[in-house]
Amino acid sequence: MKQAPQNATGTPAAAPLAHPYVGMWVTQDGHIRHELLPNGRYDEARGHRKSAYQGYYTITGHHIDYVDDTGFTAEGDFRRGVLYHAGMVLYREEPAP
């Protein structure tokens, strides 16, 4: 089972603050929403269920690995501005101005 990366103090390592993939990723119908937070955590909403899954993520190049708080792992890839994850296609949601 994968574990979240840790720093020297044994706490989860943070993702870079300025990483270009940080932000909200949403399926075309809006049902699945992945918020990649700058601290290396993610929050996934499904339909009306906010925070359905939460955990850590790491990004290496264009690949993302997820480890939720129960230990479940998943992965995905960013290609041409689109996140492909577990059979889903998610698009970046730009923040409102």
Describe every region a protein language model picked out.
Residues 1-97:
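Lipid interaction determinants
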